[in-house]
Design a protein with these regions (language model features):
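C-terminal active-site subregion of NodB/CE4 polysaccharide deacetylases
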Residues: 1-81, 88, 119-139, 220-327
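Acidic (Asp/Glu)-rich catalytic clusters
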Residues: 15, 53, 96-100, 193-210, ...
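Extended, charge-rich helix/loop segments that form flexible
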Residues: 15-17, 116-204
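A short alpha/beta connector and helix-capping loop motif
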Residues: 92-110
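Structural detector of well-ordered beta-strand residues that form the stable sheet scaffold
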Residues: 103-107, 209, 273-276
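Short beta-alpha junction loops
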Residues: 110-114, 280-281
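Alpha-helical scaffold elements lining the catalytic groove of polysaccharide deacetylases
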Residues: 182-185, 189-207, 214-241
Length: 327
């Protein structure tokens, strides 16, 4: 007998004591990729969804947020989300979700639909296809990188991404262009969804949310530019789907580092119902609906998956209890 459904019910009881777990994914790969081992392949994702269905009552995110505020969540409530808008979300993740009778919300960075490539993927693919085992990026301030083993390539990718992630958008784009020039590689054009796939995703019963146009770090932008990024992505999706878009995901998503409280207020003023972050945690009735935490389940055994979620609920419960006691 699997103990986790019963154990999760003790920390996520529903009703007045309702709590919401929101899972975060980006890609689901057709097969394992040693260079991006943080993304599950189809077999792993299928197994994860089996565990999620066993342990949780999965709700569409908009319904879950509404029921959280109404204090009418079922026990063990959860929602599933994907960020960015990768084509494999439609091609691989969607059929697996449907096979389990599950729904998810897909947050789309609209500027990369129809053949675009996000900056981080341009870097990953440039390093993947680099024809030398020693990559010298010192001329652009990014050092010299050993590419002789899978482990060293993975380390180099992480270091380069970390070095340029929080640059101003124009500086970041220039760095990426320089990397492509030095490695003599071209970006892929098949990584992201098409507009037709987004429409088909919605018609299949999945939810669609906004994720800005160009996936900038909002905290790096002036207020108007940040507002335009959010508003333009919302308008694009509303025009495409002929319906209101009420959900948003902050790019990168770390409070204070990647977005500011002024950005939270912008999201509220633009008429969104809820927004999700990448801060780890569990939402309860004290959570700001414009800053709902999420969790990436990386564990590869059912026991560890359940144990980590149970522990996260306990920590979050203790944190919120302390907050209430201090009021």
């Amino acid at each position: 007998m699997n103990p986790w459904p019963l154990l999760m019910r003790t920390v996520s009881q529903g009703g007045n004591k309702g709590r919401l777990s929101v899972f975060l994914f980006h890609r689901v790969l057709s097969e394992p990729d040693p260079l991006v081992n943080w993304d599950p392949d189809a077999v792993t994702f299928n197994e994860l969804m089996g565990w999620v269905k066993l342990c949780f009552n999965v709700l569409p995110l908009d319904q879950a947020v509404r029921r959280l505020s109404e204090r009418s969540l079922p026990p063990r409530a959860a929602s599933i989300t994907f960020d960015d808008g990768y084509a494999d979300n439609f091609q691989i993740a969607r059929p697996i979700l449907e096979s389990h009778g599950l729904t998810a919300t897909f947050f789309i960075a609209t500027g990369y639909l129809n053949g675009g490539t996000m900056w981080n993927d341009r870097v990953i693919e440039a390093i993947r296809h680099c024809r030398t085992s020693n990559l010298d990026l010192s001329s652009i301030g990014l050092g010299i990188h050993d590419l002789s083993t899978v482990a060293s390539v993975r380390h180099s990718i992480s270091e380069i991404l970390r070095s340029i992630k929080h640059l101003q958008p124009s500086q970041r784009d220039k760095s990426v262009s320089n990397i492509l020039a030095i490695t003599e590689t071209n970006p892929r054009s098949d990584l992201m969804m098409t507009s037709d796939q987004v429409i088909a995703m919605r018609q299949a019963g999945m939810q669609i949310g906004a994720h800005t146009v160009n996936h900038p770090i909002l905290a790096n932008l002036e207020s108007k530019a940040a507002c335009d990024e959010v508003a333009d992505s919302k308008c694009f999706l509303e025009d495409l789907l002929k319906e209101r878009i009420g959900l948003f995901a902050y790019p990168n998503g770390k409070p204070d580092l990647d977005y500011r409280m002024s950005d939270v207020e912008t999201i509220r003023e633009l008429g969104f119902d809820a927004a999700v972050t990448t801060a780890w945690g569990v939402a309860d009735d004290t959570t700001d609906p414009m800053q709902i935490p999420r969790f990436t389940p990386w564990d590869r055994t059912r026991f560890r998956f359940g144990a980590r979620l149970f522990q996260m609920h306990l920590r979050s419960k203790a944190h919120h209890s302390g907050q209430k006691a201090s009021r």
